[in-house]
């Protein structure tokens, strides 16, 4: 099957200009101007449209168990949302429930089997530690899993201590595995949560007030320092503080291989949204920050400091007691109402995989804050490079997968919620 996309404007991380694209069997065969129709089975006229590599969202949580419920998107519904918004590759996180890594990997493959609507891959959480876990990290390479995520928060649940993180990073460096870090100060959070509860503060806004921005900034610096000592690169997930951005910029200025990701909610919402009557909708970790932090995150996108925009897509029903109709079936999954009397019990997470690209195009490209090429870099090319998918993903060039988005730059979309 040969398909020709003609008359479009091709946008990549480096280029912007007119070109046709010839595809054979889902792979790009040729890129150039005025390509021949000879032997072509299908012609797509992209006049007036932008032609971009499909989005790569490297931060999603699908069918994730949490607080006696599960996130409301599985691989089928989550992938459909991704495709609707122009994302053609997603990466999900495998929880480290069983001590040995392989049973967890096999379980997540079973969860996704037969449900995928786009290409997908996995990261591995490392939330238990001993010598055997270190030895098993080689399994990730064998299974094609390019990355391992660790946490400096969630004491007694997922957190690793600094020496353990150091050892995992050092082992990752041996195998070319990219360490990822959820950077908050778990000890400070634990103290502040107990103080809030003792004072009778159970409202959603206290989720944010007990997870301070400077604790996150400190943990970013600590993660960078540990990575340098371990001789390892580091990818810091869902960055949302001014102090964290400053640490990222400083490390990059010294040539340290540190990479940063932010997420759309941190560009548009603040801690004050959690003080609303429906504030549970905005509960995620790390939480929404101040307008000052938000301003610095925007600057990091504009100045080339931030490397990617993921979503941390992890949606929950706001009221799981009220069913909704989806594809002819009525569905109700316990959600944010589980924490209506205690912020500690609110399932953490927001949606985003379907609207990441349209929202950022509208607010960042159409407003002139970033260029179309920078948009493609953030949404597709950079994540593909960092997680071993480039140039199969994140590129429009001969030999790349034909994961191509035809983009209507002025189109208006209405999202139902």
Show which residues each predicted segment covers.
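Histidine-rich, glycine-flanked metal-binding segment
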Residues: 1-53
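Divalent metal-coordination and catalytic microenvironments
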Residues: 8, 26, 48, 59, ...
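Metal-associated gating/positioning segment near the N- to mid-region
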Residues: 46-115, 132
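Short acidic/polar active-site loop segments enriched in Thr and Asp
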Residues: 87-89, 118, 146, 307
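Short catalytic-loop micro-motif centered on adjacent basic/acidic residues
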Residues: 90-92, 121-124, 233-238
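Alpha-helix-loop-beta-strand connector modules within alpha/beta enzyme cores
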Residues: 102-118, 166-181
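Histidine/acidic residue-rich metal-binding segments in metalloenzymes
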Residues: 132-309, 314-317, 325-330
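His/Asp/Glu-enriched, well-ordered alpha-helical/loop segment
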Residues: 202-231, 282, 315-411
């Amino acid at each position: 099957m040969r398909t020709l996309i003609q008359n479009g404007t091709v946008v990549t991380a480096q280029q912007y200009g007119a070109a046709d694209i010839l595809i054979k069997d889902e792979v790009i065969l040729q890129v150039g101007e005025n390509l021949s129709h000879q032997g072509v089975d299908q012609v797509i006229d992209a006049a007036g449209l932008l032609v971009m590599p499909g989005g790569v969202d490297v931060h999603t949580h699908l069918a994730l168990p949490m607080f006696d419920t599960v996130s409301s998107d599985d691989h089928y519904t989550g992938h459909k949302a991704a495709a609707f918004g122009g994302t053609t590759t997603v990466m999900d996180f495998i929880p480290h429930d069983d001590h040995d890594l392989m049973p967890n990997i096999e379980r997540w493959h079973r969860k996704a089997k037969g449900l995928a609507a786009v290409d997908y891959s996995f990261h591995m959480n490392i939330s238990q530690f001993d010598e055997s876990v270190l030895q098993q990290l080689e399994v990730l390479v064998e299974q094609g899993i390019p990355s391992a995520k660790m946490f400096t928060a969630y004491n007694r649940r997922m957190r690793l201590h600094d020496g353990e993180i150091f050892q995992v990073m050092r082992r990752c460096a041996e195998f070319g595995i990219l360490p990822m870090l959820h950077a908050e100060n778990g000890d400070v959070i634990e103290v502040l949560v107990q103080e809030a509860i003792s004072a009778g503060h159970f409202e959603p806004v206290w989720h944010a007030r007990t997870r301070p921005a400077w604790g996150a900034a400190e943990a970013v610096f600590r993660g960078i320092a540990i990575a340098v000592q371990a001789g390892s690169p580091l990818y810091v997930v869902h960055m949302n503080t001014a102090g964290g951005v400053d640490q990222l910029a400083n490390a990059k200025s010294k040539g340290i291989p540190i990479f940063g990701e932010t997420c759309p909610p941190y560009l548009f919402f603040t801690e004050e949204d959690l003080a609303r009557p429906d504030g549970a909708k905005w509960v995620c970790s790390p939480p929404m920050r101040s307008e000052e932090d938000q301003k610095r995150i925007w600057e990091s996108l504009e100045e080339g400091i931030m490397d990617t925009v993921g979503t941390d897509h992890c949606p929950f029903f706001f009221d799981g007691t009220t069913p909704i109709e989806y594809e002819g079936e009525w569905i109700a999954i316990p959600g944010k109402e589980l924490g209506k009397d205690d912020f500690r019990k609110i399932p953490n997470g927001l949606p985003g995989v379907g609207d990441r690209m349209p929202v950022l195009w509208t607010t960042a490209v159409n407003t002139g804050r970033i260029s179309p090429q920078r948009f493609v870099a953030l949404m597709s090319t950079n994540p593909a490079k960092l997680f071993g998918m480039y140039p199969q993903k994140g590129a429009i060039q001969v030999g790349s997968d034909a994961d191509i988005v035809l983009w209507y730059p002025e189109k208006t979309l209405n999202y139902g919620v």
